[in-house]
């Protein structure tokens, strides 16, 4: 374990003493450090009628327990304080460590003993994470140190788990959206699942906009998947034009219906554990799936601003600007009289994507988004540089396939009976509009590009993204973060994992950092907290997070690739082609071992190479035919210890998100030896070699200069490492699988790898 503590707010002695007193710690500024420390330790053992017994189980030296120490005349020293601090945080002498000083250095322990600062040290210890993954104060509250009185209690700028999660209100309302996405002449209704504590105070809301939450249709999804085996189409030379079109909602009328009291209830919905954490701390949770999902009406428009509007309508309702009904019969309306109107959205992938889309509307009431692994341009999710390009792990998927997966109205037999014919018509229109034939950018994709509206974002934003996420690739967060207005508060966490959540990792206090931000933005708590704009997980060692200023630098280093002419054959034998098509992982294994059709260049680094931004391959290329696709991957190659990309469970249920509520495992990325790590990758239709909007011809056997931008990253290579460049054509995971008999030639003497370099 290593501490990377960003959430602690440095506190004055007077404020620390005041907060400790509010928690029931009987400390006195006039008493000695030793007396105050003993009083603190005894309070930790509030379950025991006699605190001598648990105190005797702590040690202060190899030959003395804590009870004996406090009964003695010995003075409090750094050695004693450090040993006791480690033990109350769950570290066991002789098991987790033998030499405390060395262990504290390894932990990067954030508290440094000063006898005159003992009150502040005690305050800091309570706000510091235990070995279990919870802060000490959260651990104590989870055991019942504070009663669940359904009121707010704060410590170090964070809300504590004092809301009763055994008596939650679970109810359903149906919000009227200014939409008619299925064109049936009726405004769409949006089902909203609400989970909230019983409280006399107006509650802020965490809203998870999740098209998955009302169920998914995997059968329809699998039937809709596309075959990737097809020839690369030769496109006509042309210029693509698109236009910015404002979304115009339909008109709605003020509701004059009576207020209803009898709401639909539910017992369970699949929840997000970060939401659960905040539910126990006085934040209502709502789950909304939007248009075209079970319980709602309308068509699944998948990514456009009509879909975004269906979530925006819910925020409008929370602020009294939209109508919600008790049921589809629309006999009674219901008001969000329990809400304070302030909303933060949460969730990963599609869920985080909807958060970004919502933020670009500038809707009042949306105070903050926490968007994890989020899409900012749907074209860049399903296409790349004029190519159909599947997200990692999902060859054959496209946006209309996702529509089939998430149009959960068809899971309700009655809805299927009444609406499937119209749904199929609209789905066919969507399939045509996305233009899988050419892979080109068009108006359909432009209408699903949130980057063009990034200037309208006014809420605080928090993004997390994995630099090994080849599903929602790093370009998605790179482009939105760099498009954000300079006037807003923004925070980016870049980790070394893949498409995963990070709130329950041991090495970073993400959960607590979000607590402070949400108390600021949604509860109006003045807490003087400042979180760095960007925090990056160091790839060279375990559990090390560093502050960074920018994602993407203008300083570059050009690396020569060699002097040879390299030939890349596109065609595979029939058996090999079928085998790779059946299992793209077999292709990846062959590619990284140098056994697939490829051109390979190894560069032995003579100095450190700190990459920050978008690597560009500038290549001199020619094709034997009038078509060609180019794929590239950059590897950190050679055996050494690296971070894995999937977090593993260190404990199974050590994190309690409330008071015995929604327990979850503590996780971390493993650090172990492997043979390589993908740093970046990229794909291009050579007909789009200049830009997305220009379709060029490819002259047979004529040299072309190509700039292939790869996925942005931050990655540190060290002197002596090998950087491997792999150039090839068909990628069996991502691109169309064209097995035609053409070849690309690369002139390495006229080619370079252009690397953005991080400054010291």
UniProtKB/Swiss-Prot annotation:
Removes N-terminal dipeptides sequentially from polypeptides having unsubstituted N-termini provided that the penultimate residue is proline. This is Xaa-Pro dipeptidyl-peptidase. Keywords: Aminopeptidase, Cytoplasm, Hydrolase, Protease, Serine protease. GO terms for cellular component: cytoplasm. NCBIfam families: PRK05371.1-4. Homodimer. One of its GO terms (biological process) is proteolysis.
